[in-house]
């Protein structure tokens, strides 16, 4: 390897090369880091592309950071130049457009429909993530937005932040959701208090809070079904 080149995926053992694993086992078998490494192609002088990918995803926001980062913010990460930053933004934008197209056809009829959108991803998060699912008057999903990362409390779940994206999307109603990293979806008193405060704020804003789902490890709790709204 020359001094100016990064560590390439080809320099990894065959069983660790994401591209080879994709061809052998299929794209669904790859982790987020492996998928990202394929896009990056090369790493730095001391890190493989897979190492760089793992580092980028190791922060508290993980994929959410990549989804929301600007070109400048991406270039501040070691191993990411302008070309790689542009390629990542393009790939993420394609994914966002596909997700928006898919979500626009999704109708929410019950809490299980919402859990189907969120459970597989949120069950593995190692910090609490609070999200809103915005709906139109036909209960079709307009979008899913991340409100905060960290233990749910009244300061993190301020109505101004919670309703910002639903207002932008002209939502008629929202469903709240957050995960419990412990895996136990039992609502705490703080969860219930925050939810009721947001229900009241929704009444004032004309955006109904239909439910609040708490995501655990493979299971969830609906505050509406428990009559806790």
Curated annotation (Swiss-Prot):
Zn(2+) binds at residues 178, 180, 191. It comes from the Bacteria. GO terms for biological process: proteolysis. SUPFAM superfamilies: JAB1/MPN domain, RuvA domain 2-like. It holds the Pfam family UPF0758_N. Residues 107-229 form the MPN domain. A motif (JAMM motif) lies at residues 178-191. GO terms for molecular function: metal ion binding; metallopeptidase activity. Keywords: Hydrolase, Metal-binding, Metalloprotease, Protease, Zinc. NCBIfam families: PRK00024.1, radc. Belongs to the UPF0758 family. This is UPF0758 protein Moth_0536. It comes from Moorella thermoacetica (strain ATCC 39073 / JCM 9320).
């Amino acid at each position: 390897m020359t001094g100016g080149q990064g560590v390439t995926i080809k320099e990894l053992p065959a069983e660790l090369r994401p591209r080879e694993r994709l061809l052998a086992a299929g794209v669904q078998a790859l982790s987020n880091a492996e998928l990202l490494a394929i896009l990056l192609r090369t790493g730095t002088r001391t890190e493989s592309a897979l190492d760089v990918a793992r580092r980028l995803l190791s922060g508290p926001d993980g994929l959410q950071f990549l989804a929301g980062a600007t070109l400048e913010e991406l270039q501040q990460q070691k191993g990411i130049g302008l070309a790689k930053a542009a390629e990542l933004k393009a790939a993420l934008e394609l994914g966002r457009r596909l997700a928006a197209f898919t979500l626009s056809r999704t109708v929410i009829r019950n809490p299980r429909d919402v859990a189907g959108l969120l459970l597989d991803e949120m069950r593995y998060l190692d910090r609490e993530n609070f999200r809103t699912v915005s709906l139109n008057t036909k209960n079709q999903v307009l979008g899913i937005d991340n409100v905060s990362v960290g233990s749910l409390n009244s300061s993190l779940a301020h109505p101004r932040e919670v309703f910002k994206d639903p207002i932008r999307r002209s939502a008629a109603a929202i469903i709240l959701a957050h995960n419990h990293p412990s895996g136990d979806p039992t609502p705490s008193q703080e969860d219930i208090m925050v939810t009721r405060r947001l229900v009241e704020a929704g009444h004032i804003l004309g955006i109904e809070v239909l439910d609040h789902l708490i995501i655990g490890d493979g299971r969830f709790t609906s505050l509406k079904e428990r009559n806790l709204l």
